[in-house]
């Protein structure tokens, strides 16, 4: 069964992603030194972890569904690995599109590490771990252990000189280099692995009552993990070199707890709202929206307004851009319908 509140939560990540990118690309530099912009960026910082977390959930749910339809665990794991490699391949196609539109050094443009690169490799790791388990709870333990391990070794990976000998394009995947990418496997893969663990629990909830009880437990667990992460941030660091906002496991677990808590929040909201959900529709178009909006926000198409809008103007542009992207997503759906059925269907987008 398709869980609408997961689509809704993905749609929220889409809206937050657009906010983060438009404000970052279009706001004047001297308009960024206030609490409104600062809080907007903190909220925007949850988009990428949200996408990774939800991708892990989707992987686990898809695997469980295939097993129930009679496919062997070996075939299911192979399909999950294949999908991860497709996402990894799409990352390079996305970078190629960016270079064709905006230019620049072709090698650096194609090899720059973006979230799709990290998502693809993280999905591959989750698929391999899923294949190691013989039962659902074995797999959940693998995911939980890997989540904690990736988070805890992140400060060590960032600081160790042992990785200096790696070829630059490989090193960009394990620690960030300015201009070569923001996303790295450490700690970002842990969000997807944590999502896969949550997805395995969700997959076990096969009745409405079971899913309701599970979301209550998710609320308790999310609050506990977030509170523990926040409390641990006040303790002396156990690492020689770490930064709270980038490599700290305490910040990771704070965010992971909030992401887990977002599941019951989305579940409760969607239980109350029974009408059409624009947010769910946005969520189902997340890859398409990501694909087209990044180049519009940062590329040559909007060059004249890069870092030139006041904060109020940037928020207005963000709202208009979001509406336009939703319209583009519905237009894409119309084109797909026309392609599949031979006639254009009304979408009711606006």
Residue ranges and their predicted role:
Residues 1-350:
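Alpha-helical transmembrane segments and their immediate juxtamembrane cytosolic regions
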């Amino acid at each position: 069964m398709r869980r609408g509140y997961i689509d809704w939560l993905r749609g929220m990540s889409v809206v937050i992603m657009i906010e983060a990118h438009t404000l970052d690309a279009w706001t004047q530099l001297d308009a960024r030194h206030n609490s409104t912009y600062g809080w907007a960026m903190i909220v925007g910082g949850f988009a990428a972890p949200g996408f990774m977390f939800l991708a892990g959930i989707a992987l686990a749910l898809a695997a469980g569904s295939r097993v129930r339809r009679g496919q062997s665990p070996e075939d299911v794991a192979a399909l999950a690995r294949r999908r991860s490699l497709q996402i990894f391949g799409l990352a390079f196609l996305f970078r190629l599109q960016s270079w064709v539109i905006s230019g620049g050094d072709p090698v650096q443009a194609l090899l720059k590490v973006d979230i799709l690169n990290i998502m693809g490799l993280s999905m591959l790791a989750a698929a391999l771990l899923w294949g190691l388990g013989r039962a659902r709870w074995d797999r959940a333990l693998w995911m939980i252990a890997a989540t904690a391990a990736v988070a805890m070794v992140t400060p060590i990976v960032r600081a160790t000189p042992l990785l200096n000998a790696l070829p630059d394009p490989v090193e960009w995947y394990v620690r960030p280099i300015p201009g070569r990418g923001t996303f790295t496997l450490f700690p970002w893969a842990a969000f997807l692995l944590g999502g896969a663990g949550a997805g395995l629990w969700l997959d076990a909830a096969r009745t409405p009552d079971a899913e309701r009880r599970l979301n209550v437990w998710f609320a308790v667990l999310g609050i506990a993990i977030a509170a523990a992460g926040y409390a641990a941030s006040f303790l002396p660091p156990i690492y020689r070199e770490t930064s709270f906002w980038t490599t700290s496991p305490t910040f990771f677990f704070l965010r992971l707890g909030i992401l887990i808590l977002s599941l019951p929040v989305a579940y409760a909201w969607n239980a109350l709202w029974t009408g059409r959900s624009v947010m769910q529709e946005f969520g189902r178009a997340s890859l398409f929206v990501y694909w087209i909006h990044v180049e519009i926000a940062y590329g040559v198409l909007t060059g004249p307004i890069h870092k030139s809008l006041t904060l109020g103007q940037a928020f207005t542009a963000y709202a208009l851009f979001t509406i336009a992207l939703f319209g583009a997503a519905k237009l894409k759906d119309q084109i797909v319908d026309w392609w599949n059925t031979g006639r254009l269907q009304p979408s009711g987008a606006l």
